[in-house]
């Protein structure tokens, strides 16, 4: 919100949603009230499949993942990153480059998530890094969790892309 407030060309309507309640968030504002949706992770992918409005994804950059892994650095237990491929691909890249001893578990959908985290618990993982839904599911199973957050730059990049898209649609590219 702070980044959008600095941009006079952006009128921002915010709704908080995740893989469990994305439909409620989408339906809470008339589609005629906005030109583009900005979201991240699996929620962005779900919205892109079902919303009639273009969806811009806040990507999880290597920097975002590095910050999240660094925040977990002092943790002594077995660590796993769980999420959709747009999150886990970055984690896998970093694990290989930095030689981090972490488990990376991609999921396809919400149904996969609970089973994946349950299996990770059985494998001895006790810290799960992921999105909001992963974090909540891990806590339901008695595991520690940390949210993978998006950097200011990742959000700024998504805002820039949204403005470019709307201008192109309006013929002002």
Outline where the language-model segments fall:
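Non-catalytic structural scaffold of enzyme domains
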Residues: 1-173
């Amino acid at each position: 919100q702070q980044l959008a407030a600095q941009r006079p060309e952006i009128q921002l309507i915010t709704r908080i949603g995740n893989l469990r309640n994305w439909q409620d968030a989408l339906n809470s504002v008339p589609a005629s009230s906005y030109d583009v949706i900005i979201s991240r992770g699996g929620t962005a992918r779900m919205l892109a499949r079902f919303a009639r409005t273009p969806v811009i994804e806040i990507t999880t950059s290597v920097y975002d993942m590095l910050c999240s892994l660094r925040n977990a650095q002092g943790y002594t237990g077995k660590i796993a990153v769980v999420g959709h491929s747009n999150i886990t691909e970055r984690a896998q890249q970093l694990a290989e480059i930095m030689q981090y001893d972490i488990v990376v578990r991609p999921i396809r959908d919400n149904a996969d998530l609970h089973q994946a985290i349950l299996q990770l618990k059985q494998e001895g993982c006790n810290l799960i890094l992921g999105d909001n839904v992963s974090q909540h599911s891990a806590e339901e199973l008695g595991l520690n969790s940390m949210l993978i957050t998006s950097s200011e730059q990742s959000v700024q990049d998504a805002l820039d892309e949204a403005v470019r898209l709307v201008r192109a649609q309006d013929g002002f590219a």
